[in-house]
Every structure is written in C-alpha cells, then in structure tokens.
Amino acid sequence: AAAPGDGPRALADLGGVPKDLVLYQYEVCPFCCKVKAFLDFQGLPYRTVEVHPISKSQLKFSTKYKKVPVLMADGVQCNDSNEIINSLTALLAREGRLRGAPAGGGGLLGAFAGGRGGRGAAPEPSETEARMRRWVDERFARVVTVNIYETLGESFQTFEYITTECPSWGPVERHGARVVGAGLMYVIAKRMKTKYNLGESRAELFACCDEFDKALAGRRFLAGDKAPGNADLCVFGVLRAVVGTDSFREVMVHGKMKPWFLAMEAAVGESSRLSQEAGVPAPAASGA
C-alpha cells in the first residue's frame, strides 16, 4: 500500500473504488460533514478519526497539511473536501456505481474520470450544481460558522460532542479541548464576520435560506425531483453539522429548507460509518 504523506496523489491512480476509507475530521466541521454526507449517500463504508482541535496529533503523518478533512483511501492521502468528493465521484462513475441524479437533468456534479471516457465517465456538472457548490463553500458554510460560534454559549453548545463522543480522550483532555476549541472558534467567527463583510448574523443566515429557496425553484432537490446531486449533499452536510443548535432550529422554520432537509434525510438514509475513533494511532509517516 502507498504510504501516506503530503501528496497529493490522485485517487484516480487507484485500481478501483477504495475499500478502506478513514476520514480524519472534526465531528462538527461543515467541510468534514460534506464528505460524510457524500460517503453515506454513496453507501461507502468508512471510519472516522477525531482530530484534537489543539494538538492535531492524529495528523502527525501529514507534515505540511494540517487541515481537515483528510481522507486515507487504501493508503492514499487525499486532502480537501471538494477534492475528496470529486475524486470519489470519478472512481464510482468509472465503475458504474455512482448514485444520484443523472447527467443532463440538473445532473450530479461529476469530476474528471481519470481521462478514461466511456460508459463510466463522470457526468459533467450542470450550471446549478457548479454554482451551488461554490455558494456552499464561499457563502453558506461561512455564514453558518459565524452563527454557531457568534456567542460563547452557542459555541460551547456546538462543542458539547467532545465530552460524550471522544471516550478515549481523558476527562482533562476532553474538557480542555471543549473550552479552548469553543473559545478559539468564537474568536475566529468574529474575524470571519469582519473579513467577509457579513451583516447581522441571523439576517445573513435567513438570507441564505432565501437564496437556497430561489435556487431550489420548486424542485424536490437542487438536482431535480428524482434524486439529489453533490450540491444537495454539500448543503445537507453543512446543515447536518449543526443539528441541535439554535441556528439549525431557526433555519428549519424559515423558508423551504425543512421539507428539502427531510427529503435529504430520507434519500441519504442510514450512515455507512463503521466506527468513530478518537486518539487512535495515526498512519506511519512515509519519511518523505
């Protein structure tokens, strides 16, 4: 198996759809949740490793890249949520295993197919898919982040999972990660609001709901009425990251996102995650 490192090595070089998938993540990171929504919908079994938000010791094998998500796929490292989704889309399409809306009907946003055309080539993105995936990254995820970390109370609410879902971390480590992580994200949210010139946070969030309603244009999904596409999965992942927060509850009563979200829950179904591991040993470094 290929040794992990800072790559990048295209997943397209793999002989087929990878069987051993390990996602290094923060459980509530919107970009990590995009990847998990894709993996769940495609039915690809995967394990997750929770990265400590301060020490990031679980990413010690990645000497240069210290962000999440990082996917190890049959020993090959792939960084960045869009690169992960696009690469796996291409591999699944190549084998004729890609679930989702067909190309041409508001179709699934595909990626390159490793230069190998034919029956298994990934479908080209529709204008709606490409535009909405940019919108998720450049607007929606930022606005959601600013909202859930705008107050220290909601920031602590968001980091509550650390105290219950990272059992292999000691109690002091869990408490420290929650306090420092919540405080750090509170500061980052303030900086993001200034950097991206965002207005009142809830008003921006409701504006995003209205923008989504407009893009949905009466369809069941962004990709059409039959099945969701990758843009749907990305929006769904970002929202699923904040389930249980005040921001999520307010989104569910504003506009048409609730019926779409419920339809997405039904379409995605049960998670294909095999296990969640916190503090497990990272892969051996490649020495490169």
Language-model-detected regions and their locations in the chain:
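GST-like fold's C-terminal all-alpha helical module
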Residues: 131, 136-259
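Acidic carboxylate-rich catalytic motifs and surrounding loops in phosphoryl-/glycosyl-chemistry enzymes
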Residues: 50-51, 226, 276-280
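Alpha-helical recognition domains of nuclear gene-regulatory proteins
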Residues: 38, 87, 208-211, 215, ...
